[in-house]
Amino acid sequence: MMHFVPLFLVCILSLPAFQATELTKCKVSHAIKDIDGYQGISLLEWACVLFHTSGYDTQAVVNDNGSTEYGLFQISDRFWCKSSEFPESENICGISCDKLLDDELDDDIACAKKILAIKGIDYWKAYKPMCSEKLEQWRCEKP
């Protein structure tokens, strides 16, 4: 039994580390810089919206009003992505909702741009009450 414990620890410690999915304000700002200014929405506004929407967690999943919202941008399976929980989705973004849960954000940003073009920033409910003014706190200040 004594030989089993060290062997077990070696096996556990040799497993690959999982990449963190909760990002910082600066990492988010850098990762989504291509959406800055799109439809008139600044990077500071996005940093605020994403903090209040998903807590900068790329794997956030929230059930809300009969649909499920996925990822950093909290994109709903009711209209925008396809999920097994809501198979009748319009899937306007043409993407599996599961793809919105990885750390590859290009597809998330492309879908967010579609939502922004169709619905506007008010799609993200945090925008008006939390992110329409006093945005300097969302600026990334790298030392």
Curated annotation (Swiss-Prot):
InterPro entries according to UniProt: Glyco_hydro_22, Glyco_hydro_22_CS, Lactalbumin, Lysozyme-like_dom_sf
Expression across tissues: Mammary gland specific. Secreted in milk.
PROSITE patterns in alphabetical order: GLYCOSYL_HYDROL_F22_1, GLYCOSYL_HYDROL_F22_2
Record-linked PANTHER family: ALPHA-LACTALBUMIN, LYSOZYME C
An annotated Gene Ontology molecular function: calcium ion binding
Compartment annotation: Secreted
Keywords: Calcium, Disulfide bond, Glycoprotein, Lactose biosynthesis, Metal-binding, Milk protein, Secreted, Signal
Keyword presence, Ribonucleoprotein: no
Domain C-type lysozyme: 21-143
Pfam families with a match to the protein in the record: Lys
Subunit structure: Lactose synthase (LS) is heterodimer of a catalytic component, beta1,4-galactosyltransferase (beta4Gal-T1) and a regulatory component, alpha-lactalbumin (LA).
Family per similarity comment: Belongs to the glycosyl hydrolase 22 family.
Function: Regulatory subunit of lactose synthase, changes the substrate specificity of galactosyltransferase in the mammary gland making glucose a good acceptor substrate for this enzyme. This enables LS to synthesize lactose, the major carbohydrate component of milk. In other tissues, galactosyltransferase transfers galactose onto the N-acetylglucosamine of the oligosaccharide chains in glycoproteins.
SMART domains noted in UniProt: LYZ1
GO cellular component: extracellular region; protein-containing complex
Signal peptide positions on this chain: 1-20
Positions that bind Ca(2+): 99, 102, 107-108
GO biological process: lactose biosynthetic process
Residues of this chain annotated as glycosylated in UniProt: 65
Name of the molecule in the record: Alpha-lactalbumin
Record organism: Mus musculus
Highest taxon above the source species: Eukaryota
Disulfide bridges in this chain: 26-140, 48-131, 81-97, 93-111
